[in-house]
A protein has these predicted regions:
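A short beta-strand-turn-helix
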Residues: 1-22
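Short pre-active-site segment immediately N-terminal to redox-active cysteine/selenocysteine motifs
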Residues: 19-22, 26-30, 73
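Typically the conserved alpha-helix immediately C-terminal to a functionally engaged Cys/Sec
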Residues: 35-48
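A short glycine-leucine-enriched loop at secondary-structure breakpoints
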Residues: 68-72
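Cys/His/Pro-rich metal-binding microdomains
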Residues: 32-35, 78
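Structural microenvironment flanking redox-active thiols in thiol-disulfide oxidoreductases
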Residues: 44, 55-67, 99
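Hydrophobic beta-strand anchors of alpha/beta hydrolase catalytic cores
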Residues: 23-24, 54, 77
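Non-catalytic, surface beta->alpha helical segment in thiol-disulfide oxidoreductase systems
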Residues: 73, 78-110
Length: 110
């Protein structure tokens, strides 16, 4: 899984217009639900490798990004399509629900 540090300049303003949709996982190391979500996020990254970028954002280490994204609770997931549109999901999700969201993003990307 790639580290969000690489993408900080790219993510400013959420003007993503890349060739691949993105799932951003805003988390904290001390957050129980975030820890529970991690295996599902890692599985999603492996299953959709090459078709979907999955990035993790530690809100304590990336406060400017978390503040800009108005993250008020963790985990918060951003599902970003290739046009840069963001669908926000607060709270942990079961893997099957994550997979449905990922399939929709990848399918819309063509």
């Amino acid at each position: 899984m790639e580290n969000v540090q690489t993408y900080l300049p790219y993510l400013r303003g959420y003007d993503y217009t890349g060739k691949m949709p993105v799932v951003l996982d805003f988390y904290a190391t001390w957050c129980g639900p975030c820890k529970a979500l991690t295996p599902s996020i890692e599985r999603l990254a492996k299953e959709f490798e090459g078709r979907l970028k999955v990035l993790k954002v530690d809100v304590d280490k990336n406060e400017p990004l978390a503040r800009a994204a108005a993250i008020r609770s963790v985990p918060t997931l951003f599902f970003i399509d290739i046009d840069g549109n963001i669908e926000r999901q607060m709270g942990a999700m079961p893997y099957d629900a994550l997979r449905v969201k990922a399939e929709a993003l990848v399918g819309a990307a063509g």
